[in-house]
């Protein structure tokens, strides 16, 4: 079996861009992948087409070999655009391989470690009561965990003391709304640059027993995050903006996090995520993949989560209506 073409489909259905990748073979099999939207999405599409020239005529089942061709073909270590493009192609290759063998992809990854995957939903709202109402809705939908930004939306334009008070009120309102049997994760979305301030937000939220504290600082600042990790007393989660085993090796070595959150549409693909998970397992860390993109990403994450022993929980985007639901 040989690769005969690789196509891209850039679509926008109202929630942002989606870049789908289609790998076509000479045996009437094709695979579908998706590349993460990193911002310059047209450039990601062009990167896929650039990589295609190296893959035409190759055996699509040699995924490790083809990954090395794509990654090593860059003179310098790749950034978000290259790794998003590689991820989209790599995921499509797994789709081809699963179809060729007539088995679900998770069977090619070692088989099932579990029968169910725990998920959480993001919640939000302008006021503490809005957050509480959305949290109650999530619980009524069957979720046993939710994630929220503890800080108010206008946190950059109000006094810091007020940010801390409002953060405590928001998390308290959600805890009171859902009770003690629902986990609450916190995600300031890497908006805090100063270690001391991130620690202060964590301290005012700690009484409400957060499941984890995500992107507590800028994700490239492993040293600052490691310093925070030593003091915080809440599990730190990060990794959505990082890619490849090489960056995650440095993250793990810095002892900056307890929970790793690679995005399979960005980190290098499914096999790269499995390698990251194996390193994490050896260091007694757990995995909670970043998954905000939609149904394709959720399907891919399903194969990863069901076959990964140190999986913790999966982000899940619930679309009850609109274009994404129809998709």
Residue spans of the language-model regions?
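Metal- or metallocofactor-binding catalytic centers and their adjacent structured scaffolds
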Residues: 24-100
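Proline-centered loop/turn at the N-terminus of a beta-strand
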Residues: 104, 118, 183, 235, ...
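Glycine-rich, aromatic-flanked loop segments that form ligand/cofactor-binding clefts
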Residues: 90-126, 130
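Structured beta-strand/loop patches that form or line metal/cofactor-binding pockets in enzymes
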Residues: 1-32, 36, 320-326
């Amino acid at each position: 079996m040989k690769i005969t073409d690789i196509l891209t489909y850039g679509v926008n259905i109202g929630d942002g861009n989606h870049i789908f990748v289609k790998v076509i073979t000479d045996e009437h099999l094709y695979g579908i992948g998706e590349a993460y939207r990193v911002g310059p999405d047209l450039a990601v599409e062009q990167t896929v087409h650039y990589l295609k020239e190296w893959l035409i005529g190759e055996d699509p089942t040699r995924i490790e070999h083809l990954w090395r061709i794509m990654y090593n073909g860059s003179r310098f270590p790749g950034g978000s655009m290259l790794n998003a493009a590689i991820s989209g192609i790599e995921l499509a290759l797994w789709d081809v391989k699963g179809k060729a063998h007539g088995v679900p992809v998770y069977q090619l990854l070692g088989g099932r470690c579990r029968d169910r995957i725990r998920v959480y939903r993001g919640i939000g709202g302008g006021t503490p009561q809005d957050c509480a109402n959305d949290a109650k809705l999530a619980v009524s939908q069957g979720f046993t965990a939710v994630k929220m930004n503890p800080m108010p939306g206008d946190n950059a334009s109000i006094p810091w003391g007020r940010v801390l008070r409002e953060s405590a009120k928001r998390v308290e309102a959600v805890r009171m709304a859902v009770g003690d049997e629902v986990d609450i994760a916190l995600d300031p979305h890497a908006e805090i640059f100063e270690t001391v301030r991130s620690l202060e937000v964590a301290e005012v939220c700690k009484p409400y027993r957060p499941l984890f504290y995500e992107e507590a600082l800028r994700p490239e600042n492993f040293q600052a995050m490691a310093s925070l990790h030593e003091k915080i007393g809440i599990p730190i989660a990060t990794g959505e903006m990082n890619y490849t085993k090489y960056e995650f090796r440095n993250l793990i070595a810095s002892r900056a996090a307890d929970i790793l959150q690679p995005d399979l549409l960005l980190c290098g693909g499914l096999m790269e995520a499995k390698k990251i998970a194996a390193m994490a397992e050896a260091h007694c860390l757990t995995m909670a993949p970043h998954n905000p993109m939609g149904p394709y990403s959720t399907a891919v994450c399903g194969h990863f989560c069901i076959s990964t022993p140190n999986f913790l929980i999966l982000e899940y985007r619930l679309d009850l209506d609109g274009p994404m639901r129809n998709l």
